[in-house]
Swiss-Prot record:
Protein name: Keratin-associated protein 12-1
Gene: Krtap12-1
Function field: In the hair cortex, hair keratin intermediate filaments are embedded in an interfilamentous matrix, consisting of hair keratin-associated proteins (KRTAP), which are essential for the formation of a rigid and resistant hair shaft through their extensive disulfide bond cross-linking with abundant cysteine residues of hair keratins. The matrix proteins include the high-sulfur and high-glycine-tyrosine keratins.
SUBUNIT field: Interacts with hair keratins.
Record InterPro entries: KAP
Length: 130
């Protein structure tokens, strides 16, 4: 399914792989996450360096963390990169992140399950991913 209900400034949507959540695409280079009207609906950012990406719900990306980075479709979720800590990945404080695959750990490929975020180092070598 394609979504066309992106917020102002976003371009018409396009479809990504069926293995991804429904998402909207913006023209590259991507400047910020593209949020749909409801905080419960999916959002995404597809930059020129990221051909396609899976996106997590907008409720997991507070407005203050609008700058997002994309990971390959095979990795599953995107991670939130806070402007104030560019060398860190923002992961939940009150719940454990879930590592997707071992090949993604060097990118900090973790999926938060709640919206309260804290900055942790990107470099993680243990199975719990930080």
């Amino acid at each position: 399914m394609c979504h066309t209900s992106c917020s102002s400034g976003c371009q018409p949507s396009c479809c990504v792989s069926s293995s991804c959540q429904p998402s909207c695409c913006v023209s590259s280079p991507c400047q910020a996450s593209c949020f749909v009207s409801s905080p419960c609906q999916p959002s995404c950012c597809v930059s020129s360096s990221c051909q396609s990406a899976c996106c997590r719900p907008a409720i997991c990306i507070p407005v203050r963390y609008q700058v997002a980075c994309c990971v390959p479709v095979s990795c599953g979720p995107t991670v939130c990169m806070a402007p104030s800590c560019q060398s860190s990945v923002c992961v939940p404080v009150s719940c454990r992140p879930v590592c997707v695959t071992s090949s993604c750990q060097s990118s900090g490929c973790c999926q938060p399950s709640c919206p309260t975020l804290v900055c942790k180092p990107v470099t993680c070598s243990n199975p719990s991913c930080c």
